[in-house]
Regions:
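Hydrophobic, aromatic-rich cap/lid helix
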Residues: 91-113, 131
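Active-site loop/oxyanion-hole signature of alpha/beta-hydrolase fold enzymes
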Residues: 2-36, 171
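Conserved alpha/beta-hydrolase "nucleophile elbow" surrounding the catalytic nucleophile
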Residues: 40-45
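Catalytic active-site module of serine/aspartate enzymes centered on a nucleophile-bearing elbow/loop
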Residues: 149-150, 155-181
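Glycine-rich phosphate-binding loop signature in dinucleotide/nucleotide-binding domains
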Residues: 28-34, 120, 176-181
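Flexible "cap/lid" loop of the alpha/beta hydrolase fold
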Residues: 46-54, 58-88
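Short beta-strand/loop motif that positions the catalytic acidic residue
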Residues: 119-120, 126-128
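Conserved alpha/beta-hydrolase "acid-adjacent" motif
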Residues: 133-139
């Protein structure tokens, strides 16, 4: 069974903070009785990694795409500055309000999972686009810190691997999933 979660819907009626989002995400994951395989891109990867750290016995495997394990504070601040100048319509395509995205990013600045990465023992696939300069270094480092991980780079791909290289991503995912069944 496969479930796709809407992060924006998970925050409806709640404060737009990482803690609120992670709590809602955890509640969704906790509904599953069996071990789960989590796959997340960007913010979804951060949530999946956080959950695997907090619930190592529940996570069978992880796929982290464009992942960070220690938030790049300067990049987040710069990104938030840019967000303030962008029209609200740019955020609607993701289901978020502009103010919520800015608030969420602000609350993520202090996230740092370095001291907890040792809790992740499940197989981990880390994927990053060749041209994703904001996340490639961190993704490679994360792969080196996790004992049961492998790193795959998608050629000619930036941040949104799922839309920029869907076939390449699907092939990498399928090989990984075949190996954990």
């Amino acid at each position: 069974r496969s479930v796709s979660l809407s992060l924006a819907e998970m925050l409806e009626g709640k404060a737009a903070t990482y803690r609120e989002l992670y709590t809602a995400f955890s509640e969704e994951c906790d509904k599953e009785n069996d071990e789960i395989v989590l796959c997340g891109l960007s913010l979804g990867a951060v949530l999946a990694l956080n959950y695997a750290i907090d619930h190592p016995d529940k996570v069978k495997a992880l796929v982290l795409i464009a992942a960070q394990y220690k938030m790049p504070k300067k990049l987040l601040k710069f990104q938030n500055m840019l967000f303030r100048f962008m029209p609200n319509a740019m955020f609607k395509q993701f289901g978020f309000k502009k103010a919520d995205v800015i608030s969420l990013c602000d609350t993520m600045a202090e996230l740092d999972f370095r001291d907890s990465l040792c809790k992740v023992s499940c197989p981990v696939l880390i994927v990053c686009g060749e041209k994703d300069d904001a996340n490639k270094k961190a993704s490679k480092e994360l792969a080196s810190y996790l004992s049961n991980s492998c790193y795959r780079e998608l050629l000619k791909t930036c941040h949104e691997a799922n839309t920029e290289a869907p076939e390449g991503l699907a092939a990498v995912l399928q090989r990984f999933y075949d190996g954990i069944e």
